[in-house]
Amino acid sequence: MATYISQKPPKTMLPAPTADLVSRLLELRQAWGTHWIGLETLARSCLDRLGIRADRVARADTKAVIRCFLSLAGQIEAQAIVQAQASEEPAYHSRLHLADVLLCMTELLLLSRSFSDDPNHMQREHEECLGLLVALTHDYGHDGSINRAIGQLEKRSCELLIPLLNEGGISEQDRLRVCQLILLTEPSCISNNHRNIINKIFDINDLECLCVLINEADIMASVLPDTWPERTAALAKEWQSHSPQIAAQLNTHVGRLTFLQKAALFSSPASQALGLNEIKNKEISQLLS
């Protein structure tokens, strides 16, 4: 018989930046539903937190990324509202998940600046904007189902996005980078993505480094003690109609351990600054005790 884990994780002392991030993630949950701020407003706040203003950006291709990012945030919000009104918005892959990933990605990008001495400010700014765009769109068109083939949903997201990126004036090179990064969010790619940056000087101008930040942002709310129980319950609900057996495993000791040990990987300097491995390892120890 499966052993189920408590939905009330023990309190954990968090580093100050992590505690601040958790506070903002919890504010999202308080707003979710009747007081929801909307993805476009959140997207603007992420740019503000990074100090990126379209009217002060010098590069035309970066301006295009910002415009497309904000436009798609509005479009995704509008589409999701229609889904929600028809009770069709996925339980996990909802606007709340995208908001989580945007907030976590913003924090990782901000902290990553401390670990880079790259003098090319404009290139870093461009990559940060691309990172936010991928955080917003990595699950574009997700219907709440499970991959039946490797990369099935990720490929579909790219196919749906390419025309929108083209219409948004995104360069061919950046369209390719966005799709590469989305394809690398496929779960079977994650461990290799992290291996690829071993012994590298971490630099988000390197696609492999930016990829790791996106992977970390994607699952961070499912690791943090104040948010993971709700995230796990939402994913189980979403998967219930597609694969009841897998859904039932998520909140068991075995299921949680498997996720923490195999999927919840953190290797960027920014994630180390947030203490994410310590948080994860503490929970693993508690589950094994």
Residue ranges, per PLM feature:
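His-Asp-centered metal-binding catalytic motifs of divalent-metal-dependent phosphohydrolases/nucleases
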Residues: 101, 127-145, 157, 180-186
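Amphipathic alpha-helical segments in well-structured domains
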Residues: 98, 150-158
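Divalent metal-dependent phosphate-bond-processing catalytic cores, especially two-metal-ion Mg2+/Mn2+ enzymes
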Residues: 2-56, 92, 104-126, 137, ...
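Active-site flanking loop/helix segments enriched in acidic
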Residues: 70-104, 141-146
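Short alpha-helical scaffolding segments that buttress acidic/His motifs in well-ordered protein cores
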Residues: 69-81, 131-135, 178-186, 213-217
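Post-HExxH zinc-binding segment in Zn-dependent metallohydrolases
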Residues: 159-174
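Alpha-helix N-cap and coil->helix boundary residues
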Residues: 152, 173-177
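Eukaryote-specific, low-hydrophobicity, charge-rich regions
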Residues: 47-75
